[in-house]
Amino acid sequence: MDQNWMNNTTVIVTGASGGMGKGIAESLIVDHGCTVIGIARSEEKMKKVVEELGPNAEKFSYKLFDVSVEQNWIDFAKYLEDNDIHPDILVNNAGILPKFDRFEHYSMADIEKAMNINFYSAVYSIHTLLPMI
């Protein structure tokens, strides 16, 4: 397979404001020539990503929303469609890791939040965006 097959592809990366998501987004842009749309909640962190990308920032844009809300994915798909953006790859990276504790010490709210972000956000994104990819 051609090593440059990813060049000029459009990739959506969730959790792109830090950690692995930020690293994935940066590598896709710098090492592979991709255009990346980062998804996160913090505008401050996303602006920092743009700043750190320097001259490569032209290949990065971002949308701010909570990935655990299905309607946000529907709205994002409409944004892509309205702007004639055709994603090629989806990287479902967003996730949270609750503090380590005995299971019985977790509240149902903690468990629901982790499931919504770590599981349902991937389901919502794939279900909504797969027809476009």
Per-region residue spans from a language model:
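A short, exposed helix-loop element centered on a Lys and neighboring polar residues
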Residues: 126-127
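Conserved NAD(P)H cofactor-binding loop of Rossmann-fold oxidoreductase domains
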Residues: 94-99
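Substrate-binding pocket helix/loop in short-chain dehydrogenase/reductase
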Residues: 101-103, 107-113
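The beta1-alpha1 cofactor-binding region of Rossmann-like NAD(H)/NADP(H)-dependent oxidoreductases
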Residues: 44, 64-75, 108
